[in-house]
Amino acid sequence: MKYSLPTTATAPFCPSAVSHSVAVPADASPLRKLALFVGPGLLVSVGYMDPGNWATAIEAGSRFGYALLFVVVLASFSGMLLQSLCSRLGIATGRDLAQLSRERYRPGVARGQWLLAELSIVATDLAEVLGAALAFHLLLGVSITTGVVLTAFDTLIVLALQGANFRRLEAIVLGLIATIGACFFVELVLIGPYWPDVAAGLRPSWDTLSSQEPLYLAIGILGATVMPHNLYLHSSVVQTRVSGDDAASKRSAIRFSRLDTIGSLSLALLVNAAILILAAAAFHGSGHTEVVEIQDAYHLLDPLVGGALASFLFGFALLAAGQSSTFTGTIAGQVVMEGFLRAKIPCWQRRLITRGLALVPALIGVLWLGEAAVGKLLVLSQVVLSLQLPFALWPLIRFSSDRGLMGEFVNPRWVSALAWSLFGLISAANLTLLYFWFG
């Protein structure tokens, strides 16, 4: 049979192709409804445990032990709040954040938001490229440069899934998350951290953030956890569920979507905390406080833990994390293009464009700075994401707090106050970092 590349946008990666594609029967039991609503949160959670998170958490754990563990927890709770606003916005209005921004802002402002959203997607994909390339390097022995080139072939995965239903995509993502989680569970069992010290790291210590280096890492953790493109992504994919347009159905959908978000991001929190705990217990505790590269962590795990299993699981989990953007990056790219520009292109082309734009800085960085600088490039990509975050947060909080737009589903005042406080905190941290850099 002759095969030809698709010339139109195709499911399951394009929002217009999968909107209202998962039916939720009104007479279904609460557990059945919850099971049907689980999925969008999983797609979002993948971005919360990507290689960028690994780089920041490994450096934070090796340099400062468990001291920045509370930042991981606070960043994850912040993500739960913001992603819940996204699902509320999408369900209440029937439109995603990109569509609403196009409708409610002047064309020049909306176009600027689109460019920033695209930049955040490329920055995210840069982290995935570097992470997957590192995994190929560690597991197969190829050079990191060769690994970067190999990541270009993930477009074939998008082609293989063309026409698949959305639940199949969510099942694949769940498999990736389960793989990552299982690997780190075994890692922690092998290492055996001292849990009272871990618990002490959960207590906020603002003095820790008073100097530039821990603040830089804290902002990197925040940028690696709460990603701008996830805000656009979540407000769109939550609309794949069909539960009715009446107020009662929307209220139920918001409640179940909130549970999906909290549950999925709790899994991501456990993975991110496990990475930092792993680095703190294995490296900081043994005096290796300068482990800032993922490949260094991989090679050190073997002699420190006393077996090849720990390092193999580490590399395998990294590969699973690196491949995750094949799905979420493609969907997010289509969301912002359809929402801001009303443009549709074949999903394999969208994937090729995003990956191509990420490959260029990845190759330049590796060839110019050397393969040993991959970890620094990963952390930098996460800081860039944090600097862009306020530009996506502003419209999200503003729209979800607008009673004229949201009706009875408008944010409670305390939620809006908390969200705006978070916006101010992130902006202040970013400005402080810029002052350290250029002041």
Curated annotation (Swiss-Prot):
ATP-binding in keyword set: no
Could you confirm whether the keyword Manganese appears in this record? Answer: no
| Name of this chain's protein | Divalent metal cation transporter MntH 1
Compartments in which it is found: Cell inner membrane
HAMAP family per record:
NRAMP
Q: Identify the species of origin.
A: Pseudomonas aeruginosa (strain ATCC 15692 / DSM 22644 / CIP 104116 / JCM 14847 / LMG 12228 / 1C / PRS 101 / PAO1)
Query: Looking at the record's lineage, which domain of life comes first?
Result: Bacteria
Family as reported in the entry's similarity comment: Belongs to the NRAMP family.
Please describe what this protein does. H(+)-stimulated, divalent metal cation uptake system.
Q: Identify the InterPro entries for this entry.
A: NRAMP_fam (IPR001046)
**Membrane-spanning ranges:** 64-84, 139-161, 171-191, 214-234, 262-282, 300-320, 359-379, 380-400, 418-438
